[in-house]
């Protein structure tokens, strides 16, 4: 599988040695700038459509991604909106062994809102299970 090595996106990858595959990654629709005024460099996000029990890659049912960084938080929500994602499952703690593993991209309290991309995100149900 061909990785996205030629794109200058190092600041968008949580792990420099784990890249998205070109043929299955969502490509963010280009925009002149983000709502916060920052320019959009390219359509890259470290995520891939994956096979799942509901269908093949062609059906675009499941997206796997790295936990968003603080600087990719808006790109993450941009992908969610663009791809009409209806459920998000996070399988890591925000921090593990003192290191950030995922920027908190949702409001920490159910019912609260957090501005994201071109919308306000509201937490409906937050369930935390211990990770061993």
Feature map (PLM): residue ranges:
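Cys-based phosphatases of the PTP/DUSP/CDC25 superfamily and their flanking regulatory architecture
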Residues: 1-132
